Design a protein with these regions (language model features):
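A conserved short coil-to-beta-strand element within the FAD-binding core of flavoproteins
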Residues: 171-188
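Residue-level recognition of phosphate/Mg2+-coordinating polar/acidic sites
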Residues: 77, 98, 107, 122-142, ...
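Core beta-strand elements of the Rossmann-like FAD/NAD(P) dinucleotide-binding domain
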Residues: 41-43, 194-204, 283-285
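Short beta-strand to alpha-helix junction loop
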Residues: 111-119, 141-160, 214-219, 246-250, ...
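Glycine-rich loop(s) and the adjacent beta-strand/alpha-helix scaffold that form part
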Residues: 204-251
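N-terminal Rossmann-like FAD-binding beta1-loop-alpha1 element of flavoenzymes
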Residues: 43-71, 475-480
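Glycine-rich FAD pyrophosphate-binding loop
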Residues: 62-87
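Short hydrophobic core segments
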Residues: 46-48, 72, 175, 199-215, ...
Length: 487
């Protein structure tokens, strides 16, 4: 593992528009206005960050007996990243999930235990019955969406649920640091160092400040700074994840806008290193999109971390802006390779297609039967096959080269588009330094972690929301327990 150094120490279903509609039994309650002010209180839970994980943690802390729960949000609005999710439709959950759907450099067993604390079905019931969302399954993708297709509804209802539980939300409240102090009664508390106001004292802290992806919404990595500097945690070095990659298109062509379902896999670094012994990672039959800068789509995003992590940690390319290494840097980085089979068909299937009669048919026509025309033409150019070449005239050496291009094309990655385009941040506070039963820091008791600040992220498809809901719930319940017992 790479570390940045720290100091040592349902109800009935109805069929509608191709989805299974789950009818919520939650009561509809009116909106509650946000409380803008809060005061220092050594019996309070301070939640740093009003994203999906932070609001979930606040809800469960209040629901499980915490006397006072205050959410500190540095911007003027809660849940900004929720509003951007799923093209503003907000894919709140996958239909099912496995540990293999997530990426962590920590011990996988820790992640497995955390995820086992709340399964997808129970999480769905909470979203419907307690938060008040009506969800449906999009069968093509196996994802849960709100029937309203509105990410704003998800944010608003989550915030309203918190307010109903008595949670206070303070906007423009930027916490810059933490310091352990005495609570005046022989116990410990935490002092919050505020940017524009006096320090405040609280009993426990839930750190849910997110990562560095989409900095426009206010995520700037402050949570990592606090975890390392004030809480003495190591960090798995952060890097942009679920991020578009940059590079040249096949055949020197420009193919922006071309989309195709592919079978994509990552071949690990060769040479017998520990990283090189890892199994191939796959993203089967998923969308691949050519962009003006290179490559995107679920297939690319899900495996981008395999390449980006190496680039960042070899050349320090973890900047917010677009990052493009030179060809020499890429070679020096000894990157894993992303290998694509266009259309997902096997080499044997393509070989049979190219050999099938009549011999006077054009090779280009055979490719266009299974691929978008612009991509088919670009792959012919990449293989050096003329677009007027007939099947009967295709030489063996050219056929073999074309088969390689069709079924094991190595994507020429030059770099990535940085945190500005990354959906999440990889790396973060290691799970090995967190109590997996409570999400409490093993280095600084009284501080809990949840969400993207942890060394966990999921693939495209609602898995990052599942991590936010699950880790937020566990942190919130755990943070409330000692306070509710002492009241």
């Amino acid at each position: 593992m790479f570390y940045v150094g720290a100091r040592m120490r349902v109800p009935s279903q109805m069929r509608a528009f191709g989805v299974d509609r789950k009818v919520s039994t939650a009561s509809r309650k009116p909106k509650v206005s946000v409380r803008a002010q809060g005061t220092s209180d050594t019996t309070s839970v301070a939640v740093l960050g009003a994203g999906a994980a932070g609001l979930t943690a606040a809800y469960f802390a209040a629901a499980h007996g915490a006397k006072r729960v205050v959410v500190y949000e540095r911007t003027s609005e809660a849940g900004k990243k929720i509003l951007m999710s799923g093209g503003a439709r907000c894919n709140v959950l996958p239909v099912s999930a496995r540990v293999e759907d997530f990426v962590t450099e920590s011990t996988p067993r820790k992640l497995k235990n955390i995820m086992a604390s709340w399964n997808v079905e129970r999480c769905r019931e909470w979203l419907e019955n307690d938060i008040g969302l009506e969800l449906g399954i999009e069968h093509v993708t196996n994802k849960y969406f709100p029937l309203s297709n509105s990410s704003r509804e998800v944010r608003d209802k989550l915030l309203e649920a918190c307010l109903r539980e008595g949670v206070e939300v303070r906007y423009g409240a930027s916490v810059e640091g933490l310091r352990p102090v005495s609570d005046g009664a022989g116990g410990e508390a935490w002092s919050l160092r505020m940017r524009d106001s006096p320090d405040e004292q609280v009993s426990v802290v839930i750190l849910a400040m997110g990562g560095m992806s989409f900095p426009a919404v206010g995520t700037d990595g402050t949570g990592y700074v606090i975890a390392r500097r004030d809480l003495e945690h190591n960090l798995a070095e952060p890097y942009p994840a679920l991020v578009p990659l940059t590079g040249k298109h096949p055949g020197g062509e420009q193919l922006p806008g071309v989309s195709v379902n592919v079978s994509l896999q990552c071949e690990p670094i060769s040479g017998g290193t520990k990283a090189g012994k890892k199994k191939k990672a796959k993203a089967n039959r998923e969308g691949f999109l050519f962009t003006h800068r290179g490559f995107s789509g679920p297939a690319i995003l899900d495996l981008s971390h395999e390449v980006v992590r190496t680039l960042v940690r070899t050349k320090g390319g973890s900047k917010r802006e677009d990052v493009e290494q030179s060809a020499a840097d890429v070679v020096e980085a000894a990157m894993p390779s992303l290998v694509v089979s266009w259309s997902g068909e096997s080499r044997v299937e393509w070989q049979e297609r190219l050999a099938a009669p009549p011999g006077k048919a054009l090779v280009a026509t055979r490719l266009r039967d299974g691929l978008p025309q612009r991509l088919a033409d670009a792959l012919l150019a990449e293989a050096g096959v003329d677009d007027d070449c007939k099947v009967a005239d295709l030489r063996k050496v050219d056929r073999l080269k074309l088969l390689d291009v069709l079924t094991k094309y190595r994507i020429p990655v030059k770099g990535h588009q940085g945190y500005r385009k990354a959906e999440v941040t990889g790396g973060g506070v290691p799970l090995d330094e967190i109590n997996f039963q409570t999400m409490e820091s093993l280095k600084s008791p009284g501080v809990y972690f949840c969400g993207e600040v942890c060394d966990v992220f999921g693939r495209i498809g609602g898995f990052n929301f599942l991590w936010a809901w699950t880790s937020g719930r566990l942190a919130g319940m755990s943070a409330a327990k000692p306070l509710s017992e002492n009241q």
